[in-house]
Regions:
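Low-complexity, acidic/polar, glycine-enriched regions of mature
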Residues: 1-162
């Protein structure tokens, strides 16, 4: 099990008077993904208690950024653009288009959104498979070593008006 994190997300949120008409645009540099941060592994609990060697961290990062998975050299940025918001605030579902490796995929992102003065926080949790994102999980040694297909995504995004 690996914890992949990215604390360098950029983008914009256009908050409309009718909150359901708001728009979200995010970008993530794939080379900013961090593999197996020790403090984040502790937060994830018992399935992540085992310490991961630097060699394994480096190998996972190389495999993740390689042509067969994220292809960081050709596609350095993942883009996410909301297309609609529904539900009852503060708990909503954001329909979004995620562009990975130049291909767009529709996803539904459950979110809890708090807006106060000039600040907002969006946080949530969702499960996707590699296939949902047009990706094939890494495998080696004829399939003896494989990455789990399920991706559990947890996020907390803060923003403020400019």
């Amino acid at each position: 099990n690996h914890v992949i994190s990215n604390e360098n997300i950029s983008g914009s949120v256009l908050v409309s008077q009718n909150l359901y008409d708001s728009k979200i645009m995010l970008e993530l540099q794939v080379t900013d993904f961090e593999v197996d941060n020790a403090s984040l592994r502790k937060i994830e609990g018992v399935d992540f208690e085992k310490e991961v060697s630097q060699k394994d961290i480096d190998g996972t990062r190389v495999n993740m950024l390689a042509e067969k998975l994220l292809d960081a050299e050709k596609f350095p940025i993942i883009k996410i653009l909301s297309s609609s918001i529904d539900g009852k605030f503060p708990n909503v579902n954001i329909e979004a288009i995620i562009n990975i490796k130049g291909v767009e995929h529709k996803i539904i992102v459950p979110s809890t959104i708090e807006i106060e003065d000039k600040y907002f926080v969006a946080k949530g949790y969702l499960e996707l498979t590699h296939g949902d994102l047009g990706l094939v999980p890494f495998s080696a040694a004829g399939g003896a070593l494989t990455v789990r297909d399920l991706l559990v995504l947890k996020y907390e995004i803060f923003g403020k008006s400019l």
